[in-house]
Amino acid sequence: VGSKVVPMPPNATVVQVGLNDWEIGKNYPADIALHADVGETMKALIPALQRQGGKSLDKIAAGRLSMLSKINWGSRNLKTRELAKENSSVHPIDPDWLMLNVVDALPSNSIVVNESLTSSRALPDLLPFRDRYGFHGNASGGIGWGLPAAIGVQLAHPDRRVLCLSGDGSAMYSIQALWTAAHLNLPITFVITNNRSYRILKQRLLGFHKSDAYVGMDFDEPQIDFAGVARSLGVTADTITEPEAIRPAL
């Protein structure tokens, strides 16, 4: 299994199991590819491996688990929580503290739609991924996808609560989606992280071109009152500026 922390060993034998044919063999060639449910396959495979390898496999597995315990999701989750709490009183609100409050306020069985491009860096290490439909985010493509995508997700899952995270720059591309949410009476919670700029464009310009010529990338003359815009479109809204006010508002 590969991840951002531990790359796939070069000589590993790859057995890939899944129900999405398009995903099988996409990132790594599979020595054995099975179109099957992962959970059901593991139920059948684990007893067979135990019969074949016995205690020798248990010892190898224990060593690997011990190594991974320092870098796995649970470990990163604890560290990220600790770091976020250290910034719990920072002004302006620290993005990691915001994400921690968002995750802890989520009802069970919620779905998160994320287009908060530069403010959600801590989200992967805070949000547990419980099912294939529980998280939607864009890896690339056009800006402004998040707000209308949340509407589509809520319509597809009327029995689940949807939370949409969007940057202010992204929200400006499709802010009219709030009217659609109000018009359809959808119970979506929208959180717009407002840093008054296209921060993602600034980061790319600085990172790729070593330039800080940020032309047309700031929203400060005038500043945008997103809560006021939302209310004008029929959505109940508040502006949160104090770190301790995030959780009660959510």
Model region roles, listed by residue range:
Residues S56-N87, V153, N195, I200-G207:
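Charged, low-complexity, helix-prone segments enriched in Lys/Glu/Asp/Gln
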Residues V1-S69, L205, L250:
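Glycine-rich, acidic loop regions that bind phosphate or pyrophosphate groups
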Residues G25-N27, A33-H35, G39-L45, A122-L250:
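Thiamine diphosphate
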Residues K70-Q154:
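Active-site diphosphate/adenylate-binding microenvironment
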Residues V1, G18, V113-E115, L165-S166, ...:
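Short beta-strand segments
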